From Swiss-Prot:
Sequence ranges of Polar residues compositional bias: 206-217
Subcellular localization(s) per the UniProt record: Mitochondrion membrane
GO CC, one annotated term: mitochondrial membrane
Transit peptide, from-to: 1-44
Name of the protein in question: Altered inheritance of mitochondria protein 34, mitochondrial
Record-stated family: Belongs to the AIM34 family.
Amino acid sequence: MSLRKVRSLPSLRVLAEVSNPLVRVPPPSFTYQTRQVHNTKKNEHSPMLSSDSHASFTRMSLKTLKNECRTRGLKVSGKKTELVERILLFEGSSSKKLHTSAIQRAKNDSSHIDSMKIPNVAKLEAEAESRKTDYIVKVPSIVNNAATEPKTKIEKDYEKKLQPADKKPLAENVGTVATPDADNVIQTPSVSDSIKVVNPEEELRSGSSEQGRSYSQQDEELTSRDKKFLLGFAGTVAAWWSLRFWKKEESKK
């Protein structure tokens, strides 16, 4: 390509845009790169120790400085420079105390404990006892009134069964049992009225006589049965023989 053709390229591009306005040649793309640097402003770590604190206190009047000393508990008398020095010294010492919890009276103490408070043991024990009494449930004693009247249906039925035999209610059949402690008495229902004391010899004799009676009754029952059986058997045999004999006589005739 010659130099003349190269020079004529811009003019040809313009003529093409004029002849065909709908067709536009896109502009050349340029890439931009930007770099931004962040700059953080420097701040003082403790504003009470800044260089402007001295200037701020020196600008104050004598009356305001006295008020500042009075609020900090410092001495009020003196010149302006003395008041400023007192305030600055106080601010410096207070800034150091922000990061420590040591007490002044424990300076020479090598222990790691700053202070210790002994609790009131008597007060704590009284509080514990009061808490215990709050949770105690007082149940009324029902030992003396337990056997007066039957409450449940089973007890009522049991009392009805015992009344015809004892002719006394269940509440009256109550005995006492002695304990090592004389103040305590255990009440128990007494069943001595329903117990019968039996002589063993008489019991054996009555048992043997009852057994003999039962055996004799069984013998009598067996003999009557045997008699009935024998009579029935004899009757059947006689009837059978009589029928046989009757048949033979008829055959002879």
